[in-house]
Amino acid sequence: FSGGSDEYYFKPGLVWTDLSTGKISFRILPPGAIACSAGPMLYISDEAKRLYLEGYLNSIVADRYVKLLCVTLHFQWGDIAKFPVIYNKDNENNVSLLVEDNNVLSKEDWDSFETSWDFTRHPFIKAITKYPNMMDVGNIYLAECYDIWAGECEERFEKLKDNEEELNRIFIDIYGLQDELTPEVEDKDVTVRRADLGRDVRSFISYAVGCMFGRYSPTYDGLAYAGGTWDDSKYNIYKPDADGIIPICDDEYFEDDLSLIHISE
């Protein structure tokens, strides 16, 4: 593997943050990016080896070398290159499968909120589409959607934690550190989020405001409108505000007042 050379521009690799007061984390970066000093990258041409290295570098074994070799707040390329790598062919497939699963779980979590470029719809809305029988009872309550989302978050959290502990166990055995390290992962070190009522309801309000102004549509994945040509076919269930202004008044002055349209007594 190599890093920094222009021959590796736009190729997939492993990226990490150079400066941090917390634990280092290595992530897969898809094709199309260029490394920089603030976000160095490792480029590995073989996908299986890339996944294997991602599993190793995020394990408790590599964390031991981080503490030994990275003695400042910087995680520099030269220090990472000094990490001893034992490539165990017998465990290659198992490690790759676990790491691939972790990548999927982590991306599912990240894509659940508007900060992701691949955000589609709010998870509360997705809960309705996943369980269409909810529509049969007529009213759909926010509490039910949140409960479904909370269950999915907990399942994802526990699965990722189990996978990380299994990867720790594999690399502890490979490096013969059974007497030095244990595979357990603390909850605070699991990077996917558990459900949080306050945070998740606020994110839903943000999404709802986006729907009111046409940025999103409950039946359309991703951005429904971000400039350009307006496509009314994307809003077949919920129509956004016509003039892009939603008044909120004490009395009923306007027919499109927020309290009249969206808040039932």
Which residues are covered by each model-predicted region?
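Low-complexity, flexible helical/coil segments
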Residues: 2-3, 11, 50-55, 76-81, ...
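Flexible, glycine/threonine-enriched loop-and-boundary segments that flank and lead into catalytic domains
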Residues: 1-31, 174-176, 183-199
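Basic, amphipathic alpha-helical recognition segments used for DNA target recognition
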Residues: 7-10, 17-82, 96-101, 105
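Unusually extended, aromatic-enriched hydrophobic runs near protein termini
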Residues: 1, 5, 13, 22, ...
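Non-catalytic DNA-recognition/assembly elements of restriction-modification systems
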Residues: 84-260, 264
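Hydrophobic alpha-helical scaffolding
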Residues: 2-6, 14, 28, 32, ...
